[in-house]
């Protein structure tokens, strides 16, 4: 399902992200412009189109976000002193293992707000892009994706393995590392704060339409 960069109502213009509807039932509306005093009507019309396209949930963002949104995408940064005892074995994703990595990612991210569902078309971009399987003592403990100085994804398949995955990824680089996390993902935020990451900004606020 294709996104709509410019969706027009009688009240304004918005961008509709529909690509996640077939997989997560979620659509996103980014308000570009709106006639003053008609934000609610503009959002409602956009959300109605998204639901007609199959969305179960619709989130919107724009300039006039309420003080209490549903969730906030936060930026966090940290410069972890890597503990060698927590650095495990890394295995880069290959053409033969990309599907397995993608399925693990989608399974572990299923209940994480605003996490993208990866499709078969996404597998090519995982190759040579910093996506890894992390093993400890010969067994898989999780997956990670380090893109330059940015952690794109962390998912553990063994309880309590998140810290080891972060240490292992950060052993590949030096300096500050950044990541993005939804404010509703309290478990992940606790892990990152325990490892020394701090919130440095807000990327986007999402309200439920």
Residue spans for each PLM region:
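Acyl-donor-binding surface of acyltransferase catalytic domains
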Residues: 31-89, 203-207
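Short glycine/proline-centered loop/turn elements that form peptide/ligand docking sites
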Residues: 162-163, 185-188, 206-208
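Conserved donor-binding loop and adjoining core beta-sheet/short helix segment
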Residues: 1-45, 136-158
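Conserved hydrophobic beta-strand within the GNAT/NAT acetyltransferase core sheet
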Residues: 60, 151, 177-181
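Short amphipathic alpha-helix that is part of the acyltransferase structural core
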Residues: 1, 84-116
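Conserved active-site tyrosine of GNAT-family acetyltransferases
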Residues: 65-68, 192, 197
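Conserved acetyl-CoA-binding loop-helix of GNAT-fold acetyltransferases
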Residues: 36-48, 158-173, 189-194
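Active-site rim helix/loop that mediates acceptor-substrate recognition in acyltransferases
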Residues: 1-8, 111-137
């Amino acid at each position: 399902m294709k996104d709509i960069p410019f969706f027009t109502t009688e009240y304004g213009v918005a961008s509709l992200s529909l690509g996640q509807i077939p997989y997560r039932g979620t659509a996103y509306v980014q308000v570009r412009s709106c006639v003053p005093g008609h934000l609610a009507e503009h959002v409602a019309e956009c959300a109605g189109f998204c639901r007609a396209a199959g969305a179960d949930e619709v989130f919107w963002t724009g300039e006039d976000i309420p003080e209490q949104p549903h969730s906030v995408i936060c930026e966090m940064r940290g410069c972890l002193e890597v503990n060698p005892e927590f650095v495990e074995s890394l295995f880069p994703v290959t053409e033969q293992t990309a599907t397995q990595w993608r399925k693990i990612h989608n399974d572990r991210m299923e209940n994480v707000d605003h996490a993208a569902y990866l499709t078969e078309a996404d597998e090519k971009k995982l190759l040579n892009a910093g996506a890894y399987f992390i093993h400890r003592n010969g067994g898989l403990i999780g997956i990670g994706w380090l893109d330059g100085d940015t952690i794109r994804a962390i998912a553990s398949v063994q309880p309590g393995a998140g810290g080891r995955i972060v240490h292992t990824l950060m052993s590949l680089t030096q300096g500050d590392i950044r990541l993005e996390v939804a404010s509703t993902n309290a478990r992940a935020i606790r892990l990152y704060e325990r490892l020394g990451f701090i919130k440095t900004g807000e990327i986007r606020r999402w309200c439920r339409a």
